[in-house]
From Swiss-Prot:
The gene is nsa2. Component of the pre-66S ribosomal particle. Interacts with nop7 and rrp1. Interacts with rsa4 (via WD repeats). One of its GO terms (cellular component) is preribosome, large subunit precursor. This is Ribosome biogenesis protein nsa2. It comes from Emericella nidulans (strain FGSC A4 / ATCC 38163 / CBS 112.46 / NRRL 194 / M139). Its main location: nucleus.
Length: 261
């Protein structure tokens, strides 16, 4: 048994108090009074956090109540079939329609959609601006101007990228830290292929890093998967798919990613 389950272990060894159930019932009955008291008397940040917590609880409670109230509503079908011909799209009207089954199907579709965009690394460690940028001092003689920044992490820039004039370039992306290809692993096919990067979709650190094309751990990139021969539901060959970077490119010297399928 794990070390932190000592209360459960003690209960298994010695049993519960004789009035345990009664005490639990009374504690639950007092809970609503305590919640009301807290809602009325808490002030400041504690009140704000408490209201957020209660708001989330109420939403979950309403969802549960709504799920329980769903009835099996069936459409009334005519007793005798009509002799007049019906078009194809009206033929299923005569069949009984189960409302609960329909709503469940819609919920399943939504859950599938949410799972479709689930990523292998949901949380990543934050990177400070001091670590991301190096201050570049400029100025003709004094070098006192320090508005330029050099990016110290790997980046991606497209083929059509052209640098701004040096005088106006605020963010410098070194050529040695630019990557054009990524080692992408397909989780279902269990193969790793080197694919060209098309764009940086989302950097979890900062929207500015997404705009600059910074490649850090957890970044979602778009890769060209035409070599894999992946076909969409419509029968067309998929061109670009999203993948998430799973390694630390500045340490490894390469970009490793997992395809989001």
């Amino acid at each position: 048994m794990p070390q932190n389950e000592y209360i459960e272990r003690w209960t298994k060894q010695h049993g519960k108090r004789l009035d345990h159930d009664e005490r639990v019932r009374k504690r639950e009955a007092r809970q609503s009074h305590q919640q009301s008291k807290d809602a009325q008397n808490l002030r400041g940040l504690r009140a704000k956090l408490y209201q957020q917590k209660r708001h989330a609880e109420k939403i979950q409670m309403r969802k549960r109540i709504k799920a329980q109230e769903e009835k099996n509503v069936k459409s009334s079908a005519p007793s005798e079939p009509s002799k007049t011909p019906l078009p194809q799209y009206l033929l299923d009207r005569s069949e009984a329609t189960n409302a609960k089954a329909l709503s469940s199907a819609i919920k399943d579709k939504r859950a599938e959609k949410a799972a479709k965009f689930a990523v292998p690394l949901p949380k990543v460690k934050g990177i400070s601006e001091e670590e991301m940028f190096k201050v570049v001092n400029t100025g003709k003689k004094t070098h006192k101007k320090s508005w330029k920044r050099m990016i110290t992490k790997p980046t991606f820039v497209g083929n059509d990228f052209t640098r701004r004039p040096v005088k106006y370039e605020r963010f410098i992306r070194p050529m040695g830290l630019r990557y054009k290809k990524a080692n992408v692993t397909h989780p279902e096919m269990a193969v790793t292929v080197q694919l060209p990067i098309l764009s940086v979709k989302k950097n979890p650190q900062n929207p500015l890093y997404t705009q600059l094309g910074v490649l850090t751990k957890g970044t979602v990139i778009e890769v060209n998967v035409s070599e894999l021969g992946i076909v969409t539901a419509g029968g067309k060959v998929a061109w670009g798919k999203y993948a998430q970077i799973t390694n630390t490119p500045e340490n490894d010297g390469c970009v490793n990613a997992v395809l989001l399928v």
